Amino acid sequence: MGDSVLSAIQQTIIQRKSADPSESYVAQLLHKGEDKILKKVIEEAGEVLMASKDKDPSHLVYEVADLWFHTMILLTHHDLKAEDVLDELSRRQGLSGLAEKAARTES
């Protein structure tokens, strides 16, 4: 379902790593570095919180899409992909949330 969309977006973001920053928003963010990307992720997370408080489902979906997109840019900055996050979610599927949390604290 959504894997192909995430994969296509991820490929575009990866391609933008080598694009001219004057011609691509993603290239600008990647060129400016991690602090600029983190600032944008924090901004988008705040917008998600506000959209949730507004109780407007379509606005919430819009803002979550922005947050996911900018998080994917952050992942790309670290040479990671959305697929890595999906793999982690898949690994956790079927695990009790409490058991998974306990396993993290034991490590």
From Swiss-Prot:
SUPFAM superfamilies assigned to the protein according to its UniProt record, in alphabetical order: all-alpha NTP pyrophosphatases
Keyword Lipid biosynthesis in annotation: no
Record's GO cellular component terms: cytoplasm
TM annotation in the entry: none
Documented EC number(s): 3.6.1.31
Top class in the EC scheme: hydrolase
UniProt keyword terms in alphabetical order: Amino-acid biosynthesis, ATP-binding, Cytoplasm, Histidine biosynthesis, Hydrolase, Nucleotide-binding
Molecular function terms from GO: ATP binding; phosphoribosyl-ATP diphosphatase activity
GO biological process: L-histidine biosynthetic process
Subcellular location field: Cytoplasm
Pathway: Amino-acid biosynthesis; L-histidine biosynthesis; L-histidine from 5-phospho-alpha-D-ribose 1-diphosphate: step 2/9
Domain of life where this protein originates: Bacteria
Reaction(s) catalysed by this chain's protein: 1-(5-phospho-beta-D-ribosyl)-ATP + H2O = 1-(5-phospho-beta-D-ribosyl)-5'-AMP + diphosphate + H(+)
Cysteine pairs bridged by disulfides in the record: none
Any matching Pfam family: PRA-PH
Family as reported in the entry's similarity comment: Belongs to the PRA-PH family.
HAMAP family recorded: HisE
PANTHER family, sorted: HISTIDINE BIOSYNTHESIS BIFUNCTIONAL PROTEIN (PTHR42945), HISTIDINE BIOSYNTHESIS BIFUNCTIONAL PROTEIN HISIE (PTHR42945:SF9)
Protein name according to UniProt: Phosphoribosyl-ATP pyrophosphatase
Organism: Neisseria gonorrhoeae (strain ATCC 700825 / FA 1090)
Gene giving rise to this polypeptide: hisE
